[in-house]
Amino acid sequence: MTIALTDKNTLRETARKNVDQGAVTEGYDADRQEVLRLLNDSLATELVCVLRYKRHYYMAKGVKAHVAAEEFLEHAGQEAEHADKLAERIVQLGGEPDFNPDSLSSRSHAEYKPGSNLKEMVYEDLVAERIAIDSYREIIQYIGDKDPTSRRLFEEILAQEEEHADDMADILEGL
């Protein structure tokens, strides 16, 4: 059985067209503007999560605060890595990552809820992770096979968000 792939000469010729579009080739099937919007909204979500986790790290108090604070700091770093990867993908697709602090909160899937004590902080972090999980699942479904690179990026981030939610659920149970 022979698979019908594009012949080499056609691939070479097509690759020379629209070179100014970088990684976005004629074979890109997704609605690029919509994917860029989803990536930028997810970038806002990750940045809001970084800020919330950082605040919680510094504000955690109580007998069991040490364990939670370590998780808050670790998660803040991982959320920042997610933001960096999303920003890189936005640029690869010819967009501009939106780091505007004035609109972060309104574009973020999750809200910035500071919490007034350790239990509320952990609870709000768990809620935010659950929101991110559902948002990223929907984005993965929407993208499907039209943009495998963005889909894989969201799948990687989703896996870590699920770990974060599990961590927060464990800590909350112990409070």
Q: PLM features: what roles do these ranges have?
A:
Residues 1-175:
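Iron-associated oxidoreductase/ferritin-like identity signal
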